[in-house]
Amino acid sequence: MNKSVSPKYPVALIAGPTASGKSALAIRLAEIADGVVINADASQVYADLRVLSARPDPAEEARAPHRLFGYRDAAEPCSAADWAADAKRAIAAAREAGKLPILVGGTGLYLRTLIFGIAPVPEIDPAIRAEVRALPVEAAHAALAAEDPAMGHLRPQDATRIARALEVIRSTGRSLSHWQAELTGGIGGEIAVAAAIVLPPRDWLRARCDARFEAMLDQGAVEEVKKLRARGLDPMLPAMQAIGVREIAAWQDGLIDRETMVAKAQAATRQYAKRQYTWFRHQPPAAWQRIDTQLNDNEIGKIAIKLRNDALTE
């Protein structure tokens, strides 16, 4: 990799909604730019979710070095701060080896924490955390709306973020929004980001989401959920909340038929992709290029070349 003339070191970033073609673009960029692909997806960190998280398969992983994929056990939650610390080390190692770090994923919170920093929230009282985590999500959402109206905009289904906001207000006496206004620890001032925000046509993306889940069933998703459930893990763990786990579990327990299971998982995937699409359309810096085309092989090749050139001339 050529040395940048900038005092900042180059980092490529490929982000966007699920099923948008990010992984294929990242691997192609790694091949032509001597890069290392670094995962920035909250589900793909878990070893137990290779299929349902749509991790690159072994053949894809063999095409370029991959880091932070499947490196966590499902019993071990991976917070944004945890991941950011690991990502900093992975980026530093890639840089030390003379390779281009390539961040790829759809978890905006992970990327925002790494680049712009994290709220310096004090350690949460363990008793308060246990109390909050024991609440049904509906009760936690109602309590949050009453105790911290500033965070009342969280969706009732967003159990993890609701619990986090509630434990923060109860433990610190201040809203999570207050702490989030005082971000620290980001590496944005140290790196030159060459970014591609992938936002393909919505109809194409929805069809890809539906087809992807059908393919996951053929690739072993049912057995993956069976093995995960056999471990008897806390159902509130992030890995247990991953799209597809609850739907397949309900089918395995005879609560719904297969057709309903597929429809529910596909709908959940589309809804998640819609939220990601909205976030990545508006939240990243305006200077980061948006890609609004379908990522076929030809487009992937052209975008990869542009990203390589952007990264190596920053």
From Swiss-Prot:
Residues the record lists as binding substrate: 18-23
EC main group: transferase
> What are the protein's UniProt keywords?
ATP-binding, Magnesium, Nucleotide-binding, Transferase, tRNA processing
Instruction: Give the reaction(s) catalysed.
Output: adenosine(37) in tRNA + dimethylallyl diphosphate = N(6)-dimethylallyladenosine(37) in tRNA + diphosphate
User: Which Pfam families does this entry report, sorted A to Z?
Assistant: IPPT
Q: Which domain of life is it from?
A: Bacteria
Which sites bind ATP?
16-23
Name any cofactors this protein relies on: Mg(2+)
Q: Does the keyword Nucleotide-binding apply?
A: yes
Where does the record place the site Interaction with substrate tRNA?
Answer: 107
Q: Name one GO biological process term.
A: tRNA modification
Instruction: Relate the protein's function as given in its record.
Output: Catalyzes the transfer of a dimethylallyl group onto the adenine at position 37 in tRNAs that read codons beginning with uridine, leading to the formation of N6-(dimethylallyl)adenosine (i(6)A).
Q: How does it assemble?
A: Monomer.
Question: What family is this?
Answer: Belongs to the IPP transferase family.
Protein name per the record: tRNA dimethylallyltransferase
Source organism per UniProt? Rhizorhabdus wittichii (strain DSM 6014 / CCUG 31198 / JCM 15750 / NBRC 105917 / EY 4224 / RW1)
